[in-house]
Amino acid sequence: MQLKKQLIVIFFTYFIVVNESEAFFGALFKLATKIIPSLFRKRKGREVMMKRDLEQLFDPYQRNLELDRLLKQLPNY
C-alpha cells in the first residue's frame, strides 16, 4: 500500500512539473517572438515560398510537356 501511494505521489509530481515547464517555455517563446520578430518572420517567409513552389509543382492545369511527348509516341494517343 505504501508503494502504491509513493507511485501516485511521483506520478502527480511529474505531471505538475511537466505541465508547469510547458507553460513556462511557452511563455518564453511568446516573449521571444514579440522581442525578436525578425528571426521568426524569415522562417515564415521561407515556408511560404516553399509552399508556393509546391503549389506550382502540383498545379493540375500545368501541362507536363515531357509526358505529352512520350504519350504522343504511343499509337493510340
Swiss-Prot record:
Q: Which UniProt keywords apply?
A: Cleavage on pair of basic residues, Membrane, Secreted, Signal, Target cell membrane, Target membrane
Q: Which family does it belong to?
A: Belongs to the non-disulfide-bridged peptide (NDBP) superfamily. Medium-length antimicrobial peptide (group 3) family.
Q: What's this chain's function?
A: Antimicrobial peptide with potent activity against bacteria. Acts by fastly disrupting the bacterial membrane. Shows activity against Gram-positive bacteria S.aureus (MIC=1.5-3.0 uM) and S.epidermidis (MIC=1.5 uM), M.luteus (MIC>48.3 uM), B.thuringiensis (MIC=1.5 uM), B.subtilis (MIC=3 uM) and Gram-negative bacteria E.coli (MIC=12.1 and >48.3 uM) and P.aeruginosa (MIC=12.1 uM), as well as against penicillin (MIC=1.5 uM) and methicillin (MIC=3.0 uM) resistant bacteria. Antibiotic activity is not affected by major negatively charged components of the prokaryotic cell wall (e.g.
According to the UniProt entry, where is the signal peptide? 1-23
The yes or no answer to whether the keyword Glycosyltransferase is present is no
What is the name of this protein? Antimicrobial peptide megicin-18
The protein's superkingdom reads Eukaryota
Any chance you could tell me the propeptide residue ranges?
Answer: 42-77
Question: Where found in the cell?
Answer: Secreted; Target cell membrane
Q: What is known of its domains?
A: Amphipathic and cationic peptide with an alpha-helical structure.
Tissue-level expression: Expressed by the venom gland.
> According to its record, what are the GO cellular component terms?
extracellular region; membrane; other organism cell membrane
